[in-house]
Amino acid sequence: MDWQGALEKVRISKLKEMVAKNLKKSKLAEKLSENSRGHHSFHVLVAGPMKRDLIMTEGMKDLCKISWGKILKIEDRKMRIANLIVEYQPLFKEKKWFLGKPIKRKIFWFKSILPKLRVGDILSFHWDLALEKLRKRDLENLKKYTQLSIEIANYLKK
């Protein structure tokens, strides 16, 4: 079972308890809806940073969320650390949070972490670092939980 699919097994009461006790955000915990899930994007968009004095700008939230993208080009292929040009949807906020139209972005590829990638592969990345080649189900779950977190963040900001 993949870890994202396991999120469905976490009871909302446990998530609320974690938010109230560990993050010391009891008011937020009370407002969480039944469809809230403890995905990384939930933490980025809803719960906020663990360190209270850290202010996450919109651009930082885009970097911090786990993104997905399609590899368009591989640069410096012979190096241990190469660059990938990926197409992905950035996170924006106007009145509400949303994923924008696909754009190109350069990210880092540590070949020792993720040895085999090709143009056309879909992968996840975090803080501009390639993390994992995604299977279809992984991609669907990543999109699902990211969108769910966006919807919850927008609902709570009303």
Regions found by a protein language model. Give the residues of each.
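Anionic-ligand-binding alpha/beta catalytic cores of soluble enzymes and soluble regulatory domains
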Residues: 1-62
